[in-house]
Design a protein with these regions (language model features):
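Membrane-interface transmembrane helices that cradle and orient dolichyl/undecaprenyl
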Residues: 130-132, 171-187, 197, 219-221
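Specific aromatic-rich, kink-prone transmembrane helix
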Residues: 119, 123-126, 163-180, 192-194, ...
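Extracytosolic helix-loop segments that constitute the early lumenal/periplasmic catalytic or substrate-binding loops
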Residues: 28, 32-79, 83, 93-96, ...
């Protein structure tokens, strides 16, 4: 059903506004050291010493304005491509003209992920608009994105996760646009999205595989219809000339200067408290020990950190938040939020298979979009599971590595809800989302009021 444009725009603005306010509240009351990952330290007053972590990387670029002149694998987190860190350093340079208090200047770094988090919502809406969804369904899907805790946590995360997700989503969106227009300009949009994403974080390259599958499908289709597609192959050659040198520049530089492998991952030691390699594979990748799971839930603990699915559920709504110092009521809220999130995820995943595989003809989803969404989900999950297996640490199973997988089942859930004739199902989905949203908002408030 299509709403009046003014009514739809007003409701969309309200939903997006709530999402923006939740992110603003979270950033305003959370410091650059709270609920962060691999950040190290920054101290502008002390001058720069080469220490490790994302904040130290940003400070190095802020002071020196050039890439580190040492083997990046010898300093913690300096092996990451530098685009996010350069943008943060440039933002600090700009702010330093007006801000003389170094504590405030250091905290201003959060403006970059906050802006990325708002742009993420905008690009998500652009993607949702590409599908034949009703206005009510679009609002439902956008509400899910706006209140999801993992996307709220990104708004204050000073590492490169927010910018990486932004470029990954731009890759999806520009690919969908190219499938419709087939112009060289739209193709360059894909090239820049992937390349700049790889200049931000290496795992953005995972979306190149489903994009390549879409290219191959369109090439074969055009060849069958119109003969040898010389013009299209020429366009793809230009695509490669733009995306490969730019996207691979940092990695090739390190290979030439320091003999660093093109794919290099920092590994924690086996004596780390996060190590899970001693746990049976069946408990890591299928199900946790049942008695331990029940005991954790009944005592409001977030445990079974060795199990990949429990870690996905937990970190998708709570990150790696250490809850040892919080009260029983907050732990109860965390468990309820986790359960609502798990229900939404399970429902969405089930209908994702139904919409994009089993009954795709009913929903009239174009083949390129099916390839992109199915391929995007499967490829990202496969890389994630292989990564978790090869590097058996709790941090290797964090949901932030696969946040793009929020998109694909959420869109499928929208299609399924508008296609079902069961009113109680639609009401049930709405109530579940409302409960999830309330718990998410309450948890965001808890994070704010308990911030240091």
């Amino acid at each position: 059903m299509r709403m009046d444009n003014k009514k739809f725009n007003f409701r969309l603005a309200c939903i997006m506004g709530v999402g923006g306010l939740l992110r603003f509240f979270y950033v305003l009351f959370s410091t650059i050291y709270e609920r962060q990952y691999d950040i190290g330290m920054i101290d502008l007053d002390a001058g720069h010493t080469v220490s490790g972590g994302h904040l130290a990387y940003i400070q190095y670029l802020y002071h020196n304005w050039h890439l580190p002149d040492m083997d990046p694998t010898t300093v913690y987190q300096f092996h990451h491509p530098p685009l996010h860190h350069y943008v943060c350093a440039a933002w600090m340079k700009f702010c330093s003209v007006f801000i003389k208090n170094t504590d405030i200047l250091e905290e201003s770094i959060q403006a970059v992920p906050f802006l990325c988090s708002l742009l993420i919502l905008w690009v998500l809406y652009l993607i949702v608009k590409q599908f034949a969804l009703t206005d009510k369904t679009k609002l439902f899907v956008m509400a899910l994105f706006c209140v999801h805790p993992s996307l709220i946590l990104l708004s204050g995360s000073v590492n490169n996760d927010a910018m990486a997700l932004l470029f990954t989503l731009l890759t999806v969106y520009t690919t969908m646009v190219w499938c419709r227009t087939k112009t060289l300009v739209s193709l360059m949009g894909i090239a820049l999205s992937i390349a700049l994403g790889m200049c931000t974080k290496q795992n953005v390259a995972e979306m190149a595989f489903p994009v390549a599958a879409v290219f191959l499908y369109e090439l074969i289709k055009e060849w069958k219809k119109s003969g040898f597609p010389a013009k299209r192959i020429g366009h793809f050659a230009v695509f490669g000339l733009v995306s490969i040198p730019l996207g691979m520049s940092f990695y090739v530089r390190n290979l030439i200067k320091y003999n660093t492998p093109l794919v290099w991952v920092y590994e924690l030691a086996e004596d780390s408290w996060q190590y899970t390699g001693h746990i049976p594979v069946i408990n890591r990748f299928l199900w946790p020990v049942p008695t331990e799971l029940v005991d954790n839930l009944t005592h409001f603990r977030i445990g079974c950190g060795y199990n990949v699915w429990m870690q996905i559920i937990r970190t998708s709504v709570l990150g790696e938040w250490d809850m040892d110092g919080v009260g029983r009521s907050v732990k109860l809220l965390a468990v309820v939020l986790m359960l609502f999130g798990a229900l939404l995820a399970a429902w969405s995943l089930a209908v994702f298979v139904d919409v994009f595989v089993l009954r795709c003809k009913k929903y009239s989803i174009a083949m390129p979009n099916r390839i992109l969404f199915l391929g995007g989900y499967v490829v990202n999950m496969l890389f994630y599971l292989v990564f978790a297996y090869r590097y058996p640490q709790e941090c290797s199973m964090h949901f932030r590595y696969i946040e793009i997988t929020l998109l694909f089942p959420a869109v499928a859930l929208g299609f399924w809800l508008q296609g079902t004739d069961k009113t109680w199902m639609r009401w049930g989905a709405g109530l579940l989302l409302a409960a999830f949203a309330v718990c998410s908002a309450c948890m965001t408030i808890v994070w704010g009021v308990t911030a240091g």
